[in-house]
Amino acid sequence: MIERRIGDVVLQLDVGDITQQIDFDAVVNAANAQLQPGGGVAGAIHRAAGPGLAKECAPLAPISPGECVVTDGYGLPNPRVIHCLGPVYGSDEPAAVLLADCYRKALVLADEDGLTSVAFPAISTGAFGYPPEKAARVALGTITEAAAELGNVKVVRIVLYSARDLEVHEEALAEIGLR
């Protein structure tokens, strides 16, 4: 695990399973517009949470790229799930702004909900095709900027799929000055 302090917020980068983030108040779902089970992160979160999650999500859909909504966590070890629709790279524009909106809005929603810890996947880097290097810079830059405004959130973790993804994020940390 890689850890950096940004003011009062601890930023963590780790390889793991987004559905197994024990002791985190919320996990972020890289959702589809209909907030339904699918592949990747959304499928894993819905499988772990159970059918109650899809039932709660149904009236909240659809959401647009860059938007987030909050639900209960059901069978997950987390009380809350923050669902964000990331941009499809090359289709939803401006992609960097929409991706930054996901991270920023999720942190604001968590903070307003009184949550102290949030675990994110690398939003839009799977089926939505966002290049991991570019997505890492947007994610880490946005989290760094947002950290100063957070009152309740004290720990932000990005849960990555592979050691290579961790390397990409570590390089992005250096690029934004968080060595």
Where are these regions (language model features)?
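Macrodomain-like recognition of ADP-ribose-binding/processing modules
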Residues: 1-179
